[in-house]
């Protein structure tokens, strides 16, 4: 599986959330509402989630292994940094 497209849908400079993105896999499956968050150790992605009646947040869709999570995160952050650099 490959990341074939990353679209930065919204960029904000306020707070820890920096952007909302959509990621396409193999030109045939898209996941919307992935967030780019600024943490203590740099940028990371948060997968789309919903709040349960108990107040917990559960991912709607997410990678099931670290290798895939790293691949998606790398593609998303590289695209975000390219868009930010182009805008400066």
Swiss-Prot record:
The keyword Cell division is assigned to this record: yes
Coiled coil: none
Superkingdom of the organism of origin: Bacteria
Keywords, comma-separated and alphabetical: Cell cycle, Cell division, Septation
A Pfam family this chain is assigned to: SpoVG
Disulfide bonds: none
Swiss-Prot/TrEMBL GO biological process terms: division septum assembly; sporulation resulting in formation of a cellular spore
UniProt family annotation: Belongs to the SpoVG family.
HAMAP family on file: SpoVG
Record function comment: Could be involved in septation.
Descriptive protein name: Putative septation protein SpoVG
Taxonomic classification: Bacteria, Bacillati, Bacillota, Bacillota incertae sedis, Caldicellulosiruptorales
């Amino acid at each position: 599986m490959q990341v074939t497209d990353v679209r930065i849908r919204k960029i904000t400079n306020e707070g820890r959330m920096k952007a909302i993105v959509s990621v396409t896999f193999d030109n045939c499956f898209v996941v919307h509402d992935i967030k780019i968050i600024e943490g203590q150790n740099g940028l990371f992605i948060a997968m789309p989630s919903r709040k349960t009646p108990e107040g917990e947040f559960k991912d709607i869709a997410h990678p099931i292994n670290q290798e895939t999570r790293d691949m998606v995160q790398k593609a998303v952050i590289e695209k975000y940094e390219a868009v930010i650099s182009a805008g400066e």
